[in-house]
Structure formats: structure tokens, C-alpha cells
């Protein structure tokens, strides 16, 4: 029951469900051709249908923060179409622009919509985050052999692959060490901790939990991303912004965006249908890439410098200009 103040005054203490409430609310906006509505990861939210039905001549922008399609093993809850976006795709003729994070995702989404006989609106590639203006190069001395990962602790993030790779790499180079930032469900976290414990790796692999990493990244030499996929990867962007060398699996989309082979790190060949079932061989390749990065100090310093250069493409003014261009181009 709505209280008799604010919007409650409009509805005179009527008992209505949330869909009807949102429909009435959207109607009161009186949307017109000068209005732009941005739906930010709203696939499950109840205002989508009322907004579509009452948009008038306003413009709709739909922002995708996750992938639209998953192969087997790639996601714990979805297979093939990502049903978070089902309604958007079914009624895509009502949308003026889809916004995704990368050009690779843009091409993939366009092909997907055509394959499923969906209307293809304009699609723009605009990163979902930015590196602050005036961010300076770190003057910190980076810890020798240090690796950082920053993500949820979930199977899709491949932390088990990373841990096993570091264990193998440490057998060759005893300076290599890993700090794991992030949290997850207790069962999976315990599984990861047991891998470390059983290998006797507690002294060089540490679980750091969740924290603000803004002042932490610059202490590390290498950022590792062994996710099975990354729609964008804000932590990857933050890492290149602080000049870290990069290593990860050759998967869509974020790893390929921020890891430039032989420029700021290495991408490791990966095929989910074969490698996911044979992680031991995969870990041999990923461990070799980690060892290689630390073999040559001069090359590692060059990787750091190149990451800073790559980060320039993601400064705030660059991202702002992309949004301004999109708004200017809305038909």
C-alpha cells in the first residue's frame, strides 16, 4: 500500500502491484522526442515492458554488461542465449542503440541478432569504465616476481587454473608469488585454499579478500586473468592503467582488448571444449607464459611501459567523447 505522500498522493492509497505502479510512473514522465532513456543491465527488471509500451518518441539505449551467448562450460547458469537479455532481443525494434564494451562484442552481437532473425538496431562499443584523468605513473618499487589477480572467486574466473599454474612456475622460479584478491562462496573458496594447502604453497600464494585496489596495483609486476571469458574486465583496465604486465587466456573479449601479445604480456591459446577437460596440459602452457614474463627484466619493464600506453585509450575524456558521439548520432 502506498503512503499518502509523494507518488502515493497521486495513486490515492490504491493497492497496486509493482508492474502497474511502474506503468503509471512511466506514463507520468510524458516521454517525448527530446528524451533519452538508458537501460543499464535491466533484462530482469519490471520497468522494461512499461517503458517499451510508453516510450513515445523518446530514444532507448540498452547497455549490455555481460555476454549474449555462452558455450558449454562458460557460465554456471546459462547455456547458449543469455536470457537476461531475451526481452531486449525479442523486441529489439523498440531499441535505438545497444551499447557493448568492445568492438569484438559488437561484431558478435550483430551476427547473433541476424542469426536469430532479430531486428538489428545501431550498436556502439563504449567501455563501461574509464581511467581517471591525471593518473600518474607509479613511482613504487614493484615487488619482485609478484602476481595479482582481482575477481570474484568463481569457477568461471579460472582461479584454480591460475593457482596450479603459479605452483608449476614457482618450481622453476622461486621468486614468483601470487596474491588473490576477491571473494566468493565458501565451498569454492575452500576448494581453492585446499589446492594451495595440499601443494605446500601457503608461503607464496595468499588469499587477500576484498579491498580497494587503487593503491595496491602499482606494487605488482604482473596481472593474471585466466577467466573463461570477460565481457570487458574493469580489473584488466585498472591493471594496465597502473602499468602492470599482463597474462591471460586467449578468450573474448576483455583479455584480447587489454593483453597485447609481445607488447605488454602474453595470451595463452585456449579452446574451452578441449582444455577445460584437460586442465593439466593447459596449466603447463600458462605456467610457461608466467615463467617467460619474469625471465627478462628489460622486457618486463618494456611491458610495463607499453601497458601505460595502452591505457591512454581508456582515459575519461576518450570515453566521454564516445558517449557524446553516440548521443549526437541517435536518429
Go through each PLM region and give its residues.
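Single conserved hydrophobic/aromatic residue that forms the stacking wall/gate
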Residues: 1-11
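Nucleotide-sugar donor phosphate/pyrophosphate-binding loop at the beta->alpha transition
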Residues: 18-21, 69-90, 132
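Short hydrophobic beta-strand element within catalytic cores of glycosyltransferases
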Residues: 245-249
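Glycosyltransferase donor-sugar binding loop
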Residues: 130, 150, 177-191
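Aromatic "clamp/platform" in nucleotide-sugar-dependent glycosyltransferases that forms part
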Residues: 228
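A short, active-site helix/loop in glycosyltransferases that binds the activated sugar's phosphate group
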Residues: 48, 85-86, 90-121
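A conserved mid-protein helix/loop that constitutes part of the nucleotide-sugar donor-binding site
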Residues: 145, 149-168, 190
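Nucleotide-activated donor-binding/catalytic signature segment of Leloir-type glycosyltransferases, i.e.
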Residues: 190-210
Amino acid at each position: 500500500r502506498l503512503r499518502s505522500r509523494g507518488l502515493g498522493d497521486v495513486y490515492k492509497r490504491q493497492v497496486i502491484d509493482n508492474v502497474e505502479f511502474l506503468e503509471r510512473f512511466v506514463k507520468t514522465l510524458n516521454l517525448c522526442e527530446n528524451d533519452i532513456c538508458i537501460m543499464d543491465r535491466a533484462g530482469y527488471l519490471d520497468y522494461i515492458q512499461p517503458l517499451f509500451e510508453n516510450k513515445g518518441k523518446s530514444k532507448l539505449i540498452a547497455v549490455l554488461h555481460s555476454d549474449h551467448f555462452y558455450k558449454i562450460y562458460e557460465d554456471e547458469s546459462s547455456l547458449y542465449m543469455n536470457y537476461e537479455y531475451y526481452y531486449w532481443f525479442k523486441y529489439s525494434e523498440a531499441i535505438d542503440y545497444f551499447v557493448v564494451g568492445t568492438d569484438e562484442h559488437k561484431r558478435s552481437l550483430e551476427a547473433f541478432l541476424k542469426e536469430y532473425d532479430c531486428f538489428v538496431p545501431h550498436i556502439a562499443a563504449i567501455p563501461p569504465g574509464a581511467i581517471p584523468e591525471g593518473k600518474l605513473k607509479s613511482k613504487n618499487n614493484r615487488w619482485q616476481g609478484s602476481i595479482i589477480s582481482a575477481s570474484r572467486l568463481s569457477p568461471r574466473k579460472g582461479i584454480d587454473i591460475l593457482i596450479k599454474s603459479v605452483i608449476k612456475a614457482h618450481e622453476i622460479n622461486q621468486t614468483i608469488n601470487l596474491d588473490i584478491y576477491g571473494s566468493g562462496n565458501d565451498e569454492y573458496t575452500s576448494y581453492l585454499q585446499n589446492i594451495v594447502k595440499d601443494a605446500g604453497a601457503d608461503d607464496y600464494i595468499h588469499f587477500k579478500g576484498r579491498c580497494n585496489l587503487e593503491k595496491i596495483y602499482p606494487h605488482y609486476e604482473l596481472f593474471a586473468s585466466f577467466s573463461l571469458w570477460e565481457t570487458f574486465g574493469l580489473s584488466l583496465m585498472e591493471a594496465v592503467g597502473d602499468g602492470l604486465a599482463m597474462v591471460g587466456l586467449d578468450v573474448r573479449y576483455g583479455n584480447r582488448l587489454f593483453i597485447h601479445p609481445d607488447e605488454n604480456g602474453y595470451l595463452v591459446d585456449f579452446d574451452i571444449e578441449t582444455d577445460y577437460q584437460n586442465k593439466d596440459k593447459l596449466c603447463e602452457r600458462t605456467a610457461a607464459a608466467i615463467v617467460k614474463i619474469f625471465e627478462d627484466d628489460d622486457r618486463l619493464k618494456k611491458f610495463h611501459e607499453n601497458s601505460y600506453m595502452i591505457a591512454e585509450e581508456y582515459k575519461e575524456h576518450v570515453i566521454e567523447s564516445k558517449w557524446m558521439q553516440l548521443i549526437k548520432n541517435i536518429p
